């Protein structure tokens, strides 16, 4: 893929992602709002000290995980099909994805079983740490439960459920879309390479302004089973199977807009290289 083709591919993927963004922003915002109200009720009922102790047993938000399951199932069909068909067009060997939807969903749920609980736990822990800091400050200042609750609700980061939901939803739609595309591309009988596709604009991660780089990763090609490679601001290696890889640093993946494309592998005579 040349730069123009990558740009066109990214635009098509982003249009598909936008179909999911608004829906899941609303669902995540509702779950976050319920979470905040749960903490406030706990605080007013039990007091600051007891609430801090009780928060330690709250590991992750079950509703958030249910939303994640729904998102990943939907992404499996939408992006699995899109990727499968796109690779088929590029290979000039059209494939029929009939019967593969269930396979894609099962692989997505396996992925979510492996990484989803930790992803949701990380989201929950971020909220807990921020609330714990505010409660500690309130205790030190001798504030009442109502006053501490007011501080929590007025906190810029915690108070805007939609802002936090937007960050979570867009990150998870990106992650799910890329893994679904990865699964879809794997179902052909021939080998494919993968290519990192980043949109290059003022928001694209770029060193030294940001700690990680996606700008120079644009166009990087790897064999299907190899990892994309980069370095952070300090020169430390960063690897990823796909954009949004949950094994990569959070700062490398959160709010990422990159996508992954696939290119059929051909031999010296231009023939598709079949899997063995």
Label for each model-derived stretch:
Residues 160-276:
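Acidic, glycine-rich two-metal-ion catalytic cores of nucleic acid-processing enzymes
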Residues 1-159, 262-276:
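N-terminal leader/targeting and assembly helices and adjacent pre-domain segments
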């Amino acid at each position: 893929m040349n730069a123009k083709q990558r740009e066109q591919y990214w635009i098509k993927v982003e249009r598909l992602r936008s179909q999911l963004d608004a829906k899941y922003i609303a669902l995540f915002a509702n779950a976050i709002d319920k979470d905040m109200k749960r903490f406030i009720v706990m605080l007013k009922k039990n007091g600051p000290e007891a609430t801090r102790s009780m928060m330690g047993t709250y590991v992750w938000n079950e509703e958030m995980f249910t939303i994640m399951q729904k998102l990943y199932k939907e992404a499996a069909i939408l992006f699995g099909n899109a990727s499968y068909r796109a690779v088929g067009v590029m290979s000039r060997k059209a494939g029929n994805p009939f019967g593969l939807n269930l396979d894609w969903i099962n692989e997505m749920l396996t992925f979510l079983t492996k990484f989803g609980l930790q992803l949701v736990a990380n989201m929950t822990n971020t909220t807990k740490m921020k609330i714990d800091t505010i409660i500690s400050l309130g205790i030190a200042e001798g504030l009442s439960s109502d006053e501490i609750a007011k501080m929590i609700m007025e906190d810029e980061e915690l108070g805007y459920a939609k802002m936090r939901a937007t960050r979570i939803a867009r990150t998870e739609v990106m992650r799910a879309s890329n893994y679904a595309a990865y699964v879809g591309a794997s179902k052909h009988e021939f080998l494919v390479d993968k290519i990192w596709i980043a949109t290059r604009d003022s928001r694209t991660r770029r060193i030294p302004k940001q700690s990680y780089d996606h700008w120079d990763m644009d166009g990087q090609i790897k064999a299907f089973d190899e990892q994309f490679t980069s370095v952070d601001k300090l020169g430390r290696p960063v690897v990823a199977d796909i954009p949004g890889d949950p094994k990569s640093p959070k700062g490398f993946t959160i709010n990422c807009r990159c996508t992954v494309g696939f290119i059929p592998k051909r031999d010296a005579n231009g023939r598709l290289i079949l899997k063995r």
